[in-house]
Structures are given as structure tokens and as C-alpha cells.
Amino acid sequence: MKLAAQGRYDEALALIKRENPLPAICGRVCNRRCEDACTRGRVDAAVAIDEVKKFIAQRDLDAATRYVPPVVTPTRAGGFDQKIAIIGAGPAGLSCAFYLAEKGYKPVVFEKNERPGGMLTYGIPSFKLQKDVIEAEVEIIRLMGAEFRYGVEVGRDVTLDELREQGFKAFYVAIGCQGGRLAGIPGEDAEDVTVAVDFLREVNSGKIDALPGRTIVVGGGNVAIDVARNACRLGSEHVEMFCLESEAQMPASEEERREAVEDGAHISCGWGPKEVHLDESGRVCGITFKRCTRVFDDEGRFAPEYDENDLRRVDADRVVMSIGQSIVWGDLLAGSKVELGRGQGALADPQTYQTAEPDIFVGGDVYTGPSFAIDAIAAGHEAAVSIHRFVQPGSTLTIGRNQRRYTALDRDDVVIESYDNASREVAHVNRDREKAAPFSEYVETFTEEQVRAETARCLGCGASIVDPNKCIGCGLCTTKCAFDAIHLDRDRPECSTMVKYEQKLPSLGKYALKRAIKIKFGRK
């Protein structure tokens, strides 16, 4: 935020990419947990961190201004020669490829689809995330040395054993949750009943360009919102969402719900599907819902209860089920020792992501279940650390590893009464563009003036935590930090005596002599 406030956008982008290789994507689709933690929210409204990041990352969309991180040259001969395979080009796989390439590897990314991005490309609507943004971010990773092989499904076109024979030393499996779930009710096997991930994939692939009639969406999460908004923009006469939860319990965010209603979708809370009705030709003509009286039990577990006598039937031309996602493994793990747990997710070490098959690491939705892009990006970063250590002889996956534990600022201890009350900047919504091209991005990027105004709202409350197990007080970090963000102060000068450089040798000489005598004669 400080670099952006000073207009040092190139440096700001470089700093962002230390932790997030896909800032232009996250600036559009992130769930903004950083803003939830922003201290400015105690004054009025949180700083629009995501919008500022989006502005900075716009530089990546132009070849003349994009930032391609320098790649480490680890050996005299050049980069590392160990071959690493990344299976899946979603956010986790792209993140892992980025950080491995930065370390000097040439990772190979296998993607079964014809385009990279995973659910970023085939799940998130284009009016939220234009696909050329994804292509621009991927191009940077390619320029860093990663290789992308599209249209290759590992397990079908090539097996893990065959890749091992080709010299691959480690594998990162990040195929995401590409399957959907049905509700297990009568009539759901009809042609006009589909699952959300398949529906979104067809829309984003251009296979659906119009959707007349009535569309009923079952589910209350952000994916269900995306389905409903797509249906509205494709011309459905009536779009309605039905979910088990009350409005306060809905998984979808308040912002997502508001945008769906603005697009023309209706939301009915407290209903669960009972039966899909078909006409004489076997086509969907309606669906019956039953009142949901309770979603979770006393221990907070998902255990819905219904009133079977309180029913509601609605007409429908199609039904889209958005009640969960599943992992489609295919033959990827055939013959491997990788173990699967709840929901068919891969079991792995929670810190290193290593599975029971030592050279196979997992991450993203195949490990956590459906989650947000930023979580997958973080997992890919950690996997890159693990894989780097794994392929280097004599290395450990855990010792000396950055635990990356988040230490929250005590916001109750911050004095906020004296700060100004400048209002939060809001990105312009271009309704004319939205009307003319419903599937183009219509929320515009901040202007430079807005960025200056918004970054000025930052309270600068960030705090750094020093690891006393590693820091020896040498001060080298203060000279190496490219952003001049580190300063070393002597809180307890009485613990040691400071001497000028010219007097260093005489002052250290007696201690060096004493130590040499102890070593030579074994004195303790």
C-alpha cells in the first residue's frame, strides 16, 4: 500500500509477486479476507486493498509494463536439471509452477483442457474475469521457464510410471474439483438436469449462447450465484435460486447475492429439492421443494431436517444442481500408494503436502475440498518449497522451514479516534458496457487518482515479527531489503559494547585468543 501511495507501481507489483503470482486474477475474484482484517474497518470502511492490487496488476496485461520475476541461476551450468511434473493448470498448479521456475527449475504443466486456468477459466463467468487476464498471467510463468502441455490427461494419455521413465522426479497433483453432485431425488437423471460445474464449463466454452425458458438453480453458494447470473445474461425468462439455508446462513456473500438480484435472479431460502417433474416426452417441466426446518445439528454438523407437508412446486424448463463438487480422479492414481479420505480427497502431510507416495505432492481443492483461488495459490507456493527440498539430495522437508504462521495485530490496542474519515473509493460500474456486452467486465479498474486517495486511507498498522531462533542481529537484512523496509534498533545497548570499525580487530583479538586456547588445549 505504501509503495502504491508513492507511485512506485513496478516495485509494488514485484512485492506482491513474492507471495501471489496471480495478482491480476485475484484483484477480480478474491474473497478479500485481507479487507476483513483491515484495521481501517474500525474507523469506517476497510481500505479497498483488492482494487488497489487490481490497479497495480494491470501492468501485467501489457507486455511493455509486465513484471517477469528474475529467475535464480542456482548452478554454474544454469538452472536445476531435475524434471518436475505439475498436473493441472488451475491456480494451485500455476502457483507451484511460478515458484519452481523462479528457483531455477523448468517445470512441465500437464493440462487436460485446451486452455489453462482450471475453474478460473471454465467456472468463473467472463463478466467477472476476462479470460485474456488469465492468459497474460500464464504467459509470465511461461517466460520464466515453465512448459505447458495442453490436451494431455495424465492417467489416460500418459501414466505416472511412464513419466517417471521419462525422468520426472516429483509430481504435483492439482486437478481441482471438476465434477458436480446431484441431490439423489426422483427425476434428476433427465436431460435438462445438470450440475453447476458442467453448466458453467459449457457457458465458458461458448457452447451455450442462449437460454430461453425458466431456469431453477438448487444451491446457495457462490457457484450457484454464478449459475443464476449466467442464466439471466443468457436470456432466461425467470431465474430462481432455492437453498436450504436462511438468508443469514447462505454460503454466498452478501455482495454476490446483491449482484444476482440486480441481474434479475430471485432467491428463495429454506427449501430443499424433493422431486423433478417430467412431461410425457421426458423433458423437465417442474420441480417440487420441501420446507427445510433446520440445516445443522446442535454440534454444527450438516444434518438438514424437513417438513414433508410444506411443499412448493415451481415450473421449470431446466434445473441446475449446485450443491457441491467432486474430484474426478480417472486413472491418474492407478497403481500409486496415494490414499484418499473424506470426499475422495487426497491424504497428505498438512505442512509439506507429501502423500504416501513420496514423489507425489497434492494441493488445492483435491486436498482441501472446494475453496477459494487464493487458498489454492498459497498451497501451490508451499508445494514448490516441498518439491524443491525433495529433489535436492540430503534436504529435509521440514527443518528450517518457514511456518508462515499469521500473527494478527491487536486492533483493540490501536488508537483510531484521531484518524480522518475519508470515504472508501468505489470502482465505477459501467452499465452501458454491461448492457451492450453482458459477458464483458463491467466493473472498471481504479484510476490513479482513486489509488492515491484510497492508499492515503491506510493506517499503516502492519507489524513485522522477528524469529528469535534465526535472527542474530547482524543487520544484513537492512542493507539487502530492496524496499528499505527494515531497520535495526538496539533496545538493550548494555548487553554489548559498540566499537568503531577501526578498533574491531584489537577488541576482538583477546576473545579470539582465549577461544583458540580453549579449543587447542580442551579447556571448557
Question: Where does each model-flagged region fall?
Answer:
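Glycine-rich dinucleotide-binding loop and its adjacent helix/turn
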Residues: 56-77, 136-156, 180-234, 340-356
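Beta1-alpha1 glycine-rich phosphate/pyrophosphate-binding loop at the start
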Residues: 3-7, 13-19, 42, 46-50, ...
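A conserved FAD-binding loop/helix module that cradles the flavin
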Residues: 363-394
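Flanking helices and flexible, charged tails adjoining ferredoxin-like Fe-S electron-transfer domains
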Residues: 47-49, 53-83, 102, 106, ...
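Iron-sulfur cluster-binding cysteine motifs and their immediate structural context
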Residues: 1-6, 27-56, 115, 146-148, ...
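FAD-site-proximal beta/loop scaffold in flavoenzymes
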Residues: 189-212, 297-370
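Feature captures the FAD/FMN-dependent oxidoreductase FAD-binding
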Residues: 4, 78-85, 135-185, 275-288, ...
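Ferredoxin-like iron-sulfur electron-transfer modules
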Residues: 13-32, 68-85, 92, 121-122, ...
